[in-house]
Amino acid sequence: MIIVTGGAGFIGSNIVKALNDKGITDILVVDNLKDGTKFVNLVDLDIADYMDKEDFLIQIMAGEEFGDVEAIFHEGACSSTTEWDGKYMMDNNYQYSKELLHYCLEREIPLLYASSAATYGGRTSDFIESREYEKPLNVYGYSKFLFDEYVRQILPEANSQIVGFRYFNVYGPREGHKGSMASVAFHLNTQLNNGESPKLFEGSENFKRDFVYVGDVADVNLWFLENGVSGIFNLGTGRAESFQAVADATLAYHKKGQIEYIPFPDKLKGRYQAFTQADLTNLRAAGYDKPFKTVAEGVTEYMAWLNRDA
């Protein structure tokens, strides 16, 4: 069996899909379906069982077994970069992850977990997986950074695989439940389909991020499971592209629309990553050599998926 925490969420459900595509259906999805809209991410997927995250954590802490577990993909977390309840964030992202890590280490179960580019904070260059480059801007980034630091202490002694992926700006199918935290491509598509003007912040040609397609993210996760490599790795494309490029690809697909530029909100000033670009040196050195989709390629594929029933 393979366990996917956050399996009804954005990246987790795409990992479930990638496993299904390889003929793997003996999957336990762990999630919190308090937000009932997330169920749609699993409707077209095949899993063996579902468990609430609180029940799962109780069983993990009690040392209970789940049968023959081949691996755990740990994607479950609070991923809101605007959530400032530090206790909630640390319980959800840090303590939970530590419990799961020790459970896996005791049983030599591979653990592949979600870290984040938020660990780098506001820097504009040198996104390198090393302590001197890490300075998170928010408590979400800090919770991810602290778990990475914890893993670094344990890695030299670990007898089983531990791998963390610092996700950059992931976009693609199955993110609709994320609301305001969904990608720009998702929001632009919704605005166009609602007959509204698609909106970007003023200066969006200058805001550049490493936008990585979720299908590529799932591919990397499965490659690492198959190859057993441990460590903490950036997971982006290695290319920074502008929000304007995302809008251009969206409009090109729809063949209509004109961008309306809106003022940059005060509440985000100083807390907003203006530039991200993954350094892929370590990922490539680990042996992962597949190309990543460009924004034009990924957004076009995503638009076709979003509008498949149109």
Curated annotation (Swiss-Prot):
Binds 1 NADP(+) per subunit. Keywords: Acetylation, Carbohydrate metabolism, Isomerase, NADP. Pathway: Nucleotide-sugar biosynthesis; ADP-L-glycero-beta-D-manno-heptose biosynthesis; ADP-L-glycero-beta-D-manno-heptose from D-glycero-beta-D-manno-heptose 7-phosphate: step 4/4. Substrate binds at residues 169, 180, 187, 201-204, 209, 272. GO terms for molecular function: ADP-glyceromanno-heptose 6-epimerase activity; NADP binding. NADP(+) binds at residues 10-11, 31-32, 38, 53, 75-79, 92, 144, 170, 178. The active site is at residues 140, 178. Pfam families: Epimerase. InterPro entries: Epimerase_deHydtase, Heptose_epim, NAD(P)-bd_dom_sf. GO terms for biological process: ADP-L-glycero-beta-D-manno-heptose biosynthetic process; carbohydrate metabolic process. The modification N6-acetyllysine is found at residue 267. It catalyses: ADP-D-glycero-beta-D-manno-heptose = ADP-L-glycero-beta-D-manno-heptose. It is an enzyme of class 5 (isomerase). Its cofactor is NADP(+). Its EC number is 5.1.3.20. PANTHER family: ADP-L-GLYCERO-D-MANNO-HEPTOSE-6-EPIMERASE, NUCLEOSIDE-DIPHOSPHATE-SUGAR EPIMERASE. Contains a large N-terminal NADP-binding domain, and a smaller C-terminal substrate-binding domain. Catalyzes the interconversion between ADP-D-glycero-beta-D-manno-heptose and ADP-L-glycero-beta-D-manno-heptose via an epimerization at carbon 6 of the heptose. Homopentamer. Belongs to the NAD(P)-dependent epimerase/dehydratase family. HldD subfamily. This is ADP-L-glycero-D-manno-heptose-6-epimerase.
